[in-house]
Amino acid sequence: MENLESRLKNAPYFRCEKGTDSIPLCRKCETCVLAWKIFSTKEWFCRINDISQRRFLVGILKQLNSLYLLHYFQNILQTTQGKDFIYNRSRINLSKKEGKVVKSSLNQMLDKTVEQKMKEILYWFANSTQWTKANYTLLLLQMCNPKLLLTAANVIRVLFLREENNISGLNQDITDVCFSPEKDHSSKSATSQVYWTAKTQHTSLPLSKAPENEHLLGAASNPEEPWRNSLRCISEMNRLFSGKGDITKPGYDPCNLLVDLDDIRDLSSGFSKYRDFIRYLPIHLSKYILRMLDRHTLNKCASVSQHWAAMAQQVKMDLSAHGFIQNQITFLQGSYTRGIDPNYANKVSIPVPKMVDDGKSMRVKHPKWKLRTKNEYNLWTAYQNEETQQVLIEERNVFCGTYNVRILSDTWDQNRVIHYSGGDLIAVSSNRKIHLLDIIQVKAIPVEFRGHAGSVRALFLCEEENFLLSGSYDLSIRYWDLKSGVCTRIFGGHQGTITCMDLCKNRLVSGGRDCQVKVWDVDTGKCLKTFRHKDPILATRINDTYIVSSCERGLVKVWHIAMAQLVKTLSGHEGAVKCLFFDQWHLLSGSTDGLVMAWSMVGKYERCLMAFKHPKEVLDVSLLFLRVISACADGKIRIYNFLNGNCMKVLKANGRGDPVLSFFIQGNRMVVNTESNVLMFQFEHIKWQYAVEKTKQKKNKEKEEEKEENSLMEILSKCNIQVHSPRESVSSKQTVIQELLPGKPPKSRVLLKPAKFSSAVLIEELQSQGKSKSPRRDADDVEKAQKQGQLETPGKLPSHPKKKSWKIPMSPDQFLLTVSALQHAHNSGEFAYPCRPQTEITDVWGPSISYPRKVLNFKGKSIQRAVDRLRLSNPPIDVKRTSIPLEIQKLQPNLKISLHSPRVQSTIPQPMIIRSRFSGSLKGGDQVTSSIERAVCSTGPLTSMQVIKPNRMLAPQVGTATLSLKKERPRIYTALDPFRVNTEFVLLTVKEEKEHQEAKMKEYQARESTGVVDPGKVSKAAWIRKIKGLPIDNFTKQGKTAAPELGQNVFI
């Protein structure tokens, strides 16, 4: 028996040699004791609960106390880390609720009995040899279920790392220790013959507990003695690491052999060199990392630990709040415009390349290349050195106004495909089924379209003609009837997944991953033409003449349908082109490189015209009224001006920033498909205002304003008025004509508003001006007034440009000069009317009107009646015009002091002096001999001989009388800021404060004295004072000193 003790390979097959046939076990030898203990363990181990089984198993594993045995069992249980064991462990057994079962008294007695047996076996196991421990543990693991095996594997891994760390100076990694078969091992043997050995190295490493000259023995060098070397290795390792099996540890208590549940939880949780980085990071960084996960993965993270569950819950709440805020912003942005005129429309001339017969563009004869700045990049400069022709195209600021948002579907699906062609239905599919969505009632129609064997990847709905086209992963295109949902036709021919489709009349074009573009006849289902790329097709478009297709390589090809040939290939994108749009003149392509490129559809012109940059890949694009509409993967729809590349508006599809997969435009309605929902933007109905109509409306408005002003000036010209400044009465905003009080000369006031004349309001006559001196004179006045009305025709009046000086604020001097010019023009012969009352100018600084006014609004009434009443209320007077002769004296310029040579011909007019010749200086007293005077004194048919006192504007003299009339301007007193003065926050005494003030004053005086004085300016100021007769005592001449003792203004 002692000879076979070390043969572990035959350990399960050891038998007692002392036993008889009637009693096979002697119960004295180690083999019989082991067999009896295993038999008794099988009786109760499978009947106890999971907690007791786990406690007993962990207690057994803790008593191994051998690095060799721990490594041996770790290798055996390594298969428990596979996916099948992990899946079985993650399952929850709902039939057993541990800890909540009410135990009866009998069960409690049985538990106590079983616990006593477990303690006895643990005590026996702790005092057993390594051979007994190895065999009993192997047989015990055979009775464990998968969950217990996983627990055992975790506990053994933790215990092994603990034992390894307890050995100080262990320089050999555990990977250098392994099991290897003996060299004389036969494959026919029932058990595997293994022994523990160290991997061969260049140098042997000593163990910590051994002397320096003792080394771990490797494999047997002599092939004749494998068993001795194996025995020596095992005994040496057992001696070094665990000592003798029958020696218990100091302080060993057999009552504590059963492990508590807390210790089991700590051991079975596993031991790893990795750390939970989410727990160690700050909370905001942990939430930022978890926020990058999708919702499904975030729900899984909540099962990792309590900390992760709390973080995941907070991230969900933050995402929900952020989404709510962004959705509110999305709804509110529909009623906000960034200074863009949403009603703008115009017809502009757009350059297009001029082509020759072979379809190539014409270049200029003498090309000039010029570097363009950022502001110079537009459509007109894109055709550099190319001959172009102008095409009239309409432009509008589409989708720049206010809009309402309606959610049609709120289901997250990144594989959703939709199509909308106007009307009330939307075709939606994300798998093999297709259903229709009513956008008015926001509900699905019960008709479903089934028949595809694979998921649907392309749709085209034609609601007007009552059919639906769908392209699928099953390589087929199906033609469906909308009302019945029956597939009536199948288009077969593609050898790859259908990725895109487009329809024009009865021609269908489709592209697939088989690098083919096929043209079909919708009525017959036959393939008419096939075009090929070298890469899978991602987008295709068709019209009556051309087909445009793009592929994953980034190439865009234009095909001619009738001729079935390639027109041109457009290259410039660095990524796959996913979307296309083209019309008669231009082509747009959107790519994964974040660019939308504009090309010309005319002939074979292949140069890129414009590029519109996006932060992420472009998924859909359209061109409408010279406005580029693009959908980006950042969740925004952008509207660009095609002419200059400016971004006019940005529409957010949702608050989460999900990519906009596609959008469809019909009228003032836009249907948007994102990964998280389907939206409809309903824009307001806009009446477009073209630039030509605006100019016409502006001209008509100006003509109406001119007519109103002319009628107002006609009224003012027929009455005695006084012009009053708006500064006198701020509350008065209208034009007023006021009759004067009796006893004063005929006078009236006019208050001019600075804005345009929207209406004219007359002040009614407050009191009669008195009866006329003779009724004959009144009759004559009426007669003359009627004659005057006949003479005042628009054709006879001279044409004058419209003056807009009243529409802008002016200074008082400008206002008085304007009134004076009007008076002189009024007194001239061209505007001289009989019976026209004179006007006098009231000083602009004079007092405002103190007497009450009665305002009469004659809007809608006859103005002529009011004019006649005002004309008859003022008696006419005779008018005589006089003039003062002028004296003109011509001067000869002195050319000697000219800066130019005498040979240079001068263009300066001859100077002259013009001054009035007064009566005292004239020879002959009152005789008038001047021809100019005779011409001036001649009377016309509309003049009289009575003298008029001229209305002159005299410059006010500087004096107290004039200054008193002027309004004193309000003085603004600003208090000093104490914080600005006491910026240093220094506490000073009274004496220190005085010293500080004196120092500041000296500093200020020194700064003022150092100022540079211009001697020229000082001399000029002195001469001016001397001319005015003012003293110049304070004037100091340069280099001289004033000597007042010698006399006034005497300098030495």
UniProtKB/Swiss-Prot annotation:
Supply the alphabetized keyword list.
Answer: Coiled coil, Repeat, Ubl conjugation pathway, WD repeat
Q: What induces it?
A: By disease-causing laminin A mutants also inducing CBX5 and CBX1 proteasomal degradation.
Give the start-end ranges of region Disordered. Answer: 766-805
Q: Which domain of life is it from?
A: Eukaryota
Q: Which SUPFAM superfamilies does this entry report, sorted A to Z?
A: F-box domain (SSF81383), WD40 repeat-like (SSF50978)
Kindly indicate where the leader peptide sits in this chain: none
Cite the InterPro entries for this sequence.
Answer: F-box-like_dom_sf, G-protein_beta_WD-40_rep, SCF_subunit_WD-repeat, WD40/YVTN_repeat-like_dom_sf, WD40_repeat_CS, WD40_repeat_dom_sf, WD40_rpt
User: What PROSITE patterns does the annotation carry?
Assistant: WD_REPEATS_1 (PS00678), WD_REPEATS_2 (PS50082), WD_REPEATS_REGION (PS50294)
| GO cellular component terms given for this protein | cytosol
Question: Which intervals carry biased composition (Basic and acidic residues)?
Answer: 775-786
- WD repeat windows: 169-206, 409-447, 451-490, 493-532, 534-569, 572-609, 611-652
**Cited CDD domains:** F-box_FBXW10 (cd22136), WD40 (cd00200)
Coiled-coil region list: 690-719, 986-1010
Q: Where is the F-box domain?
A: 276-323
Q: Which PANTHER family match?
A: F-BOX AND WD REPEAT DOMAIN CONTAINING PROTEIN 10B-RELATED, UBIQUITIN LIGASE SPECIFICITY FACTOR/HREP PROTEIN
Query: What function does this protein fulfil?
Result: Probable substrate-recognition component of a SCF (SKP1-CUL1-F-box protein)-type E3 ubiquitin ligase complex which mediates the ubiquitination and subsequent proteasomal degradation of target proteins. Overexpression is leading to degradation of CBX5 and CBX1.
This chain belongs to the protein called F-box/WD repeat-containing protein 10
The scientific name of the source species is Homo sapiens
Gene of origin? FBXW10
